Design a protein with these regions (language model features):
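N-terminal cysteine/histidine-rich coordination modules
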Residues: 1-74
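Metal-dependent nuclease catalytic cores that hydrolyze phosphodiester bonds in DNA/RNA
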Residues: 42-46, 52-110, 116, 120
Length: 257
């Protein structure tokens, strides 16, 4: 069967307009690929049933990770007690025209986390044999059941750099919104980008918790990374207070009036 043109594909009523504007570009883990024009143009047109099964599997995966996030939220206050005051992180100033997005504290915090995560995995891999499935600290747990370890690593490394990138997009977008007051009555692109960054932070925190459970002897060394993400989350929410309420096409339901 000949491949459909982009115009023909776009006429599919099951597609969700604009769903790809505020996603994390992780098609392999997306639960809504059946409604995405971008995914449809890149996938095999004969695999419709497989696409639906793919979406169901991914929905279950993210629901499980969401439950892990709820668990780790209960642990963070105890971990943070002697490390830092998460209730009162430094407040972020509103970005101005002169402020360089690259040098914004939120950007720096996102990049610093990415570097620290790289350092952690580098040390882990030096102590591991093989590095993809087990590690010196708690290697027996990971060796007996490698899937949680592999899933956690995959999630962490997917969002590792994206958090800073999406944060920078949010900061840059807000700068443009300040300069163009005509956009004031519309949903803010900066809030949408900030929400994607926040979701990346949430999922990374949950994945680090899975890593703790897979590598119990490494659990303590993971705590600073979780606290770093939690501090960034709070600061980002302070800087973009409407971000969590932003409605992403397809991913978020519109609350009843």
């Amino acid at each position: 069967m000949p491949r459909k043109t982009l115009t023909e594909l776009a006429q599919n009523p099951d597609l969700i307009p604009g769903i790809y504007n505020y996603c994390d570009r992780w098609c392999e883990r997306c639960p809504l690929t059946s409604g995405c024009l971008v995914y449809t143009t890149e996938s095999d047109p004969t695999d419709n049933n497989d696409t639906l099964n793919h979406d169901v599997r991914n929905a279950v995966f993210w629901q499980t990770l969401s439950e892990t996030l709820a668990e780790v939220r209960q642990l963070i206050p105890e971990w943070a007690k002697d490390a830092l005051n998460l209730n009162h992180p430094p407040k972020q100033k509103t970005i101005t025209r002169q402020r360089n997005v690259d040098n914004h504290p939120l950007t720096k915090a996102g990049k610093q986390y990415a570097n620290n995560a790289s350092d952690w995995f580098r040390k882990l891999d030096l102590d591991s044999d093989p590095p993809s499935t087990s590690a010196k600290c708690g290697s027996e747990v990971a060796r007996q059941n490698p899937q949680p370890f592999d899933d956690a690593r995959e999630v962490i490394q997917w969002y590792q750099y994206q958090i800073a990138v999406k944060t920078m997009r949010a900061l840059s977008g807000r700068k443009e919104e300040i300069e163009d007051p005509e956009t004031a009555d519309f949903p803010k692109d900066s809030d949408g980008s900030a929400k994607v960054a926040l979701i990346g932070i949430d999922r990374s925190i949950a994945a680090w918790r899975l890593m703790q459970l897979s590598l119990p002897d490494c659990a303590e060394s993971i705590v600073p990374l979780i606290l770093q993400l939690e501090t960034l989350r709070i600061s980002l929410e302070q800087s973009f207070p409407e971000a969590r309420a932003f409605i992403r096409p397809g991913f978020d339901s519109i609350p009843p009036a």
